[in-house]
Every structure is written in C-alpha cells, then in structure tokens.
Curated annotation (Swiss-Prot):
It comes from Saccharomyces cerevisiae (strain ATCC 204508 / S288c) (Baker's yeast). Belongs to the flocculin family. Coiled coil: none annotated. This is Putative uncharacterized protein YAR062W. Residues 1-110 form the PA14 domain. InterPro entries: Flocculin, PA14/GLEYA, PA14_dom. One of its GO terms (biological process) is flocculation. SUPFAM superfamilies: Anthrax protective antigen (SSF56988).
Length: 198
C-alpha cells in the first residue's frame, strides 16, 4: 500500500503496528518509501524502515511496535506499507499518534492521500522542509527595582532542533516592582514562546 501522509502540524509522529501476523514494514519519506510523484514506480530497495515487524515462525506476535518520524506541516510524505501473510489468519492494525496525543487507527481519511504519477508535473520537485530556517521569538517579563518599564531586544542565530540555523529573537521587558501583582506573574518571570517557519 502506498500513499502520501500529510501532517497537520510540525512535530514528531509515531506510527505503530499493534499486532503483526506475519510480517510488515512501514517506510516514511522520499528515498525510503518511494520518490515524489513515483508512487506506482518499481520499489526503492532501501532497508531504512520506519517499522520492521516480523512474527517468528511458531512464535508470538510482536506487540505494539513503532517508529517515530519528525515531519513538517503542509508537506506530503511518501508512505509505504509492505505486508505478507503465511498460513491462515493474518492481521495488521496500523495507527499513528499525532503530536497532540490523538491516535488515528486504520482509517486515515484526511491524513493519507493518493495521486496519479506524473513526473512531468511542475510541482513534483519539492524542497526539503528540514532545510528551512526557523525563527523563534521569546518574550520575558521581569520585575526590577527601577521606576520605569524597560524593553530590550537581542537577536542571535542558534542551531535549531532540526540541526539548521535558527534565528532567535529574545525580548525582555522589565517592569518596576511597584506594579500591581495582578498585572504580572507572581513568579519572577513569565515566558511566552512561539515558533514561525519561514
């Protein structure tokens, strides 16, 4: 089975086989499952599987085996499942745990899509989303002994979680300790963090 998985948000996704009888592999990503716009082409010979589950002959079924993949929202990721069964009964329940903790099982409507192969499509070549620069903005409010509110901004470049350069902006607002406690957190600082992918 092949298709394209469309993650709703940027984060880690954990794919699982609850039980495997007799064997199955799951591959996610180009160069692993299949190349973009080549869903029906001969298979890639990669052995870099996201999940590799095999029931031993005369043995018990593997339980809840899984693999985690970091994905970027809005990008279609090639997804391939290869399944085999020998001698009678077979099973392969598939699920994915979304970043918010929701588990989607067996019915992947709204998450997995299929398209006709057309290598001449102008949109077949896609950029690698992990190479995009990320911006992080952090705002901190601190109490201080001064009589006025002061704001400072510092900009730096750090290595992001994807190993790529990440622009980080830190905004520090200092408020006088005479401010009412209802307008500031009772702790010494309040932090709001947001990430923006450019």
């Amino acid at each position: 089975m092949t298709g394209y998985f469309l993650p709703p948000q940027t984060s880690s996704y954990t794919f699982r086989f609850a039980k495997v009888d007799d064997s199955a592999i799951l591959s996610v990503g180009g160069n692993v499952a299949f190349e973009c716009c080549a869903q029906e082409q001969p298979p890639i010979t990669s052995t870099d599987f996201t999940i590799n589950g095999i029931k031993p002959w005369q043995g018990s079924l593997p339980d809840n085996i899984g693999g985690t993949v970091y994905m970027y929202a809005g990008y279609y990721y090639p997804l391939k499942v290869v399944y085999s069964n020998a001698v009678s009964w077979g099973t392969l329940p598939i699920s994915v745990e979304l970043p918010d903790g929701t588990t989607v099982s067996d019915d992947f409507e709204g998450y997995v899509y299929s398209f006709d192969d057309d290598l001449s499509q102008s949109n077949c070549t896609i950029p690698d989303p992990s190479k995009h620069t990320t911006s992080i903005v952090t705002t901190t409010t601190e109490l201080w002994t001064g009589t006025f509110t002061s704001t400072s901004t510092e900009m730096t470049t750090v290595t992001g979680t994807n190993g790529q350069p990440t622009d980080e902006t830190v905004i520090v607002a200092k408020a006088p300790t005479t401010a009412t406690s209802s307008s500031l957190s009772s702790s010494s600082s309040e932090q709001i963090t947001s990430s923006i992918t450019s």
